[in-house]
Structure formats: C-alpha cells, structure tokens
Regions:
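N-terminal glycine-rich anion-binding loop in soluble enzyme alpha/beta folds
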Residues: 2-73, 140-170
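Buried hydrophobic positions in well-ordered alpha/beta secondary-structure cores of metabolic enzymes
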Residues: 9-12, 98, 136, 189
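N-terminal glycine-rich phosphate/adenylate-binding segment common to multiple enzyme folds
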Residues: 73-120, 187-197
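Generic structural signal for hydrophobic
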Residues: 90, 180-183, 204
Length: 229
C-alpha cells in the first residue's frame, strides 16, 4: 500500500524559524496531510545584528520571536529582501503555497509564483462579519504598534480599542492585560499577532466573556481546506 503523499506548505515568520510555538497549535488542524517547511526573515542573524533594525519614527513596526524564545522589535523595511529570498527558497522546495506567520501588512513588492497567504488579509475580511456592532478590541504585542493598529482597524470597523501585551512575555502580564480590558465595550477580541496561542485565547475569552479570534488557527483552518482531499 502506497504511503500518503503530504502536501508541502511553506511558512515564513518575520522572526527566526522554526516557529515550534505556532506549529504546536496548528499541525493537528492539517490532520497529518501537510508538511510544513519554514523560513524566517531573521534566520542566521545574531541579536546584535538585529538591533541594527530598531524602528525609527515612521517605520512600520514588527514584533517576533527568536530561536531562544525571546522576542525582538524591529522595522519591517529591513527584512523585505530577506522575506523575498525566503519565498524563493520555499518555492524551490516545491511548496504548493506559502503562509505568512505574521499578521502585519506587507508591501506588494513581495512576489511569489505560488499563492502567498497573509493572515492580515483574512482578518480584514472575516472580522467585520463577526461583529454586529462593528466594535472590536485588538490586542497587539507592543506599545509601538498601537497607533498603526488603530489606523488599520479604524478603516475596517466603526469602533476599535487597542491595547498592547506581548505574547512573548510573562504569563502574569497576559493575565493582567486580560483583566484590564475585560469591561471594554466590544463585540469581539482580536489577538493581532501570530504569537498568541490557543491557551492565551482561552484566557482572554474567560476574562472578557467575548468571542476571541486567534490568527494562527484561523490561518491554518483556511489553508487546511486545500489539503483536506
């Protein structure tokens, strides 16, 4: 009996690969029918080298995870060429399509020969469908991202409240953040970073009593439609 051939799916993190924290929550969704091949925008770089990417005023800010489990904050513009290289490498490995392990917005200059699936594009379309009052609470990793998050979501929904709490910090900080926002008026909570886990989703759902959108599983469930054959 022939072994089942798994579909090759690329995954690009803006930080360092592999993102074992993300795949821990999503591999079960693919039900053994997919092989995930990963690359990262900061792969091969030391923390000292990454510090040269520190955001300046006007930069689009990203937060991601390094191999040692710590997080870094950096300007997107520094890694665009590295992301393009990652796309090319994954295409050469025969991936059917590529998932971006980041909810940030990326420039149209990134090109791929296979479908390149951005969580932000999914969120932009799905979130308005799930809030009757067009009112959401967004959790973003860094205070440096609050303004860009407010600007982005205010174009999509009528009312948005944004708070900052890193998925890469201490669990106590997440508990405090969830407690602080539990009375915020909103229909829906959006954990706007691929770093937020299923356990973190459950924490915010319990504290706020509201439905919570988790990008990593939303992305995987959409992509699994293409592997479920």
């Amino acid at each position: 009996m022939r072994g089942e051939v798994k579909m090759k799916i690329g995954a690009i993190t803006v930080g360092q690969s592999p993102r074992t924290d993300v795949t821990a929550d999503i591999m079960g969704i693919f039900n053994g029918k997919a092989e995930i091949l990963e690359r990262g925008g900061l792969d091969g770089l030391t923390r000292e080298q990454i510090q040269e990417f520190t955001p300046k005023e006007g930069d689009y800010v990203l937060v991601s995870r390094l191999n040692d489990g710590t997080s870094v904050t950096f300007a997107e513009r520094h890694i665009i060429p590295r992301l393009q290289q990652a796309i090319q490498e994954l295409e050469e490995q025969g991936t059917a399509f590529i998932m971006m392990f980041c909810t940030g917005k990326f420039p149209d200059t990134l090109k791929a020969k296979v479908p390149l699936i951005y969580p932000c594009e999914i969120l932009d379309r799905v979130v308005p469908l799930l809030t009757a009052a067009s009112s959401i609470l967004v959790v973003t990793p860094s205070p440096l991202q609050i303004t860009q998050s407010e600007e982005k979501w205010s174009r999509i929904v009528a009312q948005v409240s944004v708070t900052a709490c890193s998925p890469y910090g201490e669990w106590k900080e997440l508990e405090e953040a969830a407690s602080l926002v539990k009375d915020t008026k909103a229909d829906l909570v959006v954990l706007d970073c691929i770093g937020f886990s299923q356990e973190m989703k459950q924490l915010f759902a319990k504290e706020t009593g509201k439905p919570v959108i988790l990008p990593r599983t939303l992305l995987a469930r959409l992509v699994s439609e293409l592997t479920d054959v």
